[in-house]
């Protein structure tokens, strides 16, 4: 598991390495397990303004800012979506907003999760 002291790039490398070890069904099972392990989001936060629109599943991303660091709570009605969001939230949780803004799409692409997402996710 990652720690809050790790940088974004270190967390990306951790998750990318874990995901690359798995193929096919095993990768999906791993992502589903991340969904099960993710912190529960109270129903009071499952509001329209926290919902990601355009996603086939219902996905809520609840941001919190503490001491100039971002924390994300995520939930979904679909395990693959929730697991994927939980991995991304883990990468960015506890990071400074300036560090998050420096992340490129190439950095995130190293995770290899784009391939499993449909256009609706």
Model-found features: residue ranges?
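C-terminal binding/interaction regions
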Residues: 2-3, 14-17, 76, 98-103, ...
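Extended low-complexity intrinsically disordered regions
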Residues: 3-45
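A general alpha-helix detector
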Residues: 14-15, 84-87
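Structural motif
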Residues: 21-25, 75-80, 120
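Amphipathic alpha-helical interface surfaces
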Residues: 27, 57, 80-85, 96, ...
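Short, hydrophobic/amphipathic alpha-helical patches that form generic packing surfaces
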Residues: 33, 86-90
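Structured beta-strand/loop patches that form or line metal/cofactor-binding pockets in enzymes
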Residues: 42-64
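Conserved interaction-surface patches within small, structured recognition/assembly domains
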Residues: 64-80, 89-93
């Amino acid at each position: 598991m990652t720690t809050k002291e790790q940088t974004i790039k270190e967390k990306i490398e951790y998750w990318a390495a874990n995901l690359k070890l798995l193929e096919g069904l095993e990768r999906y099972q791993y992502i589903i397990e991340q969904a099960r392990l993710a912190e529960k989001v109270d129903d009071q936060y499952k509001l329209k303004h926290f919902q990601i629109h355009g996603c086939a599943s219902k996905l809520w991303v609840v941001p919190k800012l503490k001491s100039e660091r971002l924390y994300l709570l995520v939930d979904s009605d679909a395990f693959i979506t929730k697991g994927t969001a939980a991995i991304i939230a883990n990468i960015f949780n506890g990071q400074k907003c300036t560090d998050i803004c420096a992340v490129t799409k190439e950095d995130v692409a190293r995770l290899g999760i784009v391939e499993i997402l449909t256009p609706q996710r």
